[in-house]
C-alpha cells in the first residue's frame, strides 16, 4: 500500500493496529516492504512473534543505525479480545535494554520509534527519555501532537535528546536531516 510506496525504513505498532484483531494485523504486516519493530510487546499468536522484531539495524551511508520500537499499554486502551495474549513490557526498562544492546552492537545512531505519546500518564516519550540513556533520537506518535520544531528531553546523563511528532492521520509528514560527527 501507500506506506510501501513512501519508502519507510521501519515502523512500529500503534493501538489502532489492534482494531481488527491480531490475525488482521499479522496479515497487514506481512504485506509491508519494511520491518515492524516493537520491543515492549511479546506475541504468541498469528506468527506475530516471527513478524514483529524488537529492533532492526540499518546501514546507510556508512553508518550503522539501530532502530527499536515502543508501544503503549493495551489494557484499557484496546478491547482485550483484539490483543489476545499480547504481553506488555515496561517501556522504560525495555528502552534501556534496547539502547544497551544496540550500543554493544556498535551502532553509530540509536533511534526509538515510539507510539507512547509525548506526556502520557508517566509512560510517554518524555518520561522514557528522562529515565534512560543511550538513545539519540525519538520519533513519536500516539498523542497526536504536532511539533513545529523539535522538542528536547534530557536523558539520565543530562544530554538533550531530540523528539519529533508529526500530528495524526498523515496530515503532516516529517523530514529530518541528521548531521553529526562519527567518533
Spell out what each predicted region is.
Residues 1-183:
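Acidic, metal/ion-coordinating pockets
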Amino acid at each position: 500500500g501507500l506506506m510501501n510506496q513512501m519508502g519507510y525504513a521501519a515502523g512500529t505498532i500503534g493501538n489502532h493496529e489492534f482494531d481488527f484483531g491480531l490475525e488482521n494485523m499479522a496479515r497487514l504486516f506481512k504485506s509491508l516492504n519494511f520491518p515492524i519493530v516493537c520491543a515492549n510487546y511479546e506475541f504468541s499468536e498469528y506468527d506475530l512473534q516471527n513478524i514483529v522484531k524488537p529492533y532492526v539495524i540499518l546501514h546507510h551511508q556508512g553508518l550503522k543505525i539501530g532502530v527499536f520500537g515502543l508501544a503503549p499499554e493495551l489494557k484499557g486502551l484496546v478491547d482485550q479480545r483484539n490483543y489476545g495474549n499480547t504481553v506488555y513490557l515496561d517501556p522504560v526498562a525495555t528502552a534501556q535494554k534496547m539502547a544497551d544492546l544496540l550500543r554493544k552492537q556498535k551502532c553509530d545512531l540509536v533511534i526509538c520509534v515510539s507510539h507512547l505519546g509525548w506526556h502520557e500518564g508517566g509512560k510517554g516519550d518524555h518520561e522514557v527519555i528522562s529515565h534512560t540513556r543511550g538513545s539519540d533520537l525519538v520519533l513519536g506518535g500516539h498523542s497526536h501532537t504536532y511539533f513545529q520544531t523539535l522538542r528536547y528531553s534530557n536523558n539520565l546523563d543530562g544530554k538533550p535528546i531530540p523528539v519529533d511528532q508529526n500530528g495524526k492521520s498523515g496530515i503532516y509528514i516529517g523530514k529530518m536531516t541528521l548531521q553529526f560527527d562519527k567518533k
